[in-house]
C-alpha cells in the first residue's frame, strides 16, 4: 500500500505500540478522513495483520456469538477465514466500521486482559446504538479522536 501523507495519528500509533501496557485502541472520527489508511500503513510494522470490516464483510458480525474472550473471537474469525494467522505478540487486529457491530466494544476488555494481540477499532461511531452494547470496556481501552487534515499536516505534505 502506498502511503504518502504523514498524519499526527502516525506518531501516536508508534508510541502506542511501544507501550508495554497498551490498551485496545478506538480511533474515532468523521468519515473519509484517513483512519483506515493510517491504520493499514501502521499495520506494516507487524508480522501479521487481521482486518475485519463489519460493513463490507457482514459475515463477521457473528464473531461474538460464542463469547467475548480472545479465544472465542479468534476461533469464530478463523472459521470464516482460515488463512488468517494469529501469532501472539506479532499480530494486529483491526475491527473497522465498529459502529456496525455494537458488541465489538465489549470484547476489548478481554483482549486487554489477555494481552497477546494488539487491537485497534475504527469507525465514525455515527448512529451507534449504545443500548445494544453489553459493555463499553471502560478502563480497558484507549480512545483517539482523529480529525481531518489540519494545517500543520498540510504543511508536512509540502
Regions found by a protein language model. Name each.
Residues 1-158:
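Phosphate-binding site recognition
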Amino acid at each position: 500500500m502506498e502511503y504518502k501523507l504523514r498524519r499526527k495519528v502516525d506518531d501516536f500509533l508508534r508510541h502506542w505500540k511501544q507501550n508495554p501496557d497498551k490498551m485496545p485502541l478506538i480511533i474515532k472520527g468523521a468519515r473519509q478522513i484517513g483512519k483506515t489508511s493510517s491504520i493499514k500503513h501502521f499495520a506494516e510494522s507487524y508480522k501479521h495483520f487481521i482486518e475485519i470490516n463489519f460493513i463490507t464483510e457482514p459475515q463477521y458480525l457473528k464473531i461474538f456469538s460464542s463469547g467475548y474472550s480472545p479465544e472465542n473471537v479468534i476461533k469464530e474469525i478463523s472459521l470464516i477465514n482460515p488463512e488468517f494467522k494469529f501469532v501472539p505478540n506479532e499480530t494486529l487486529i483491526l475491527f473497522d466500521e465498529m459502529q456496525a457491530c455494537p458488541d465489538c466494544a465489549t470484547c476489548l476488555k478481554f483482549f486487554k486482559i489477555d494481552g497477546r494481540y494488539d487491537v485497534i477499532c475504527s469507525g465514525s461511531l455515527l448512529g451507534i446504538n449504545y443500548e445494544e452494547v453489553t459493555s463499553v470496556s471502560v478502563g480497558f481501552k484507549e480512545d483517539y479522536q482523529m480529525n481531518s487534515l489540519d494545517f500543520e499536516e498540510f504543511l508536512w505534505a509540502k
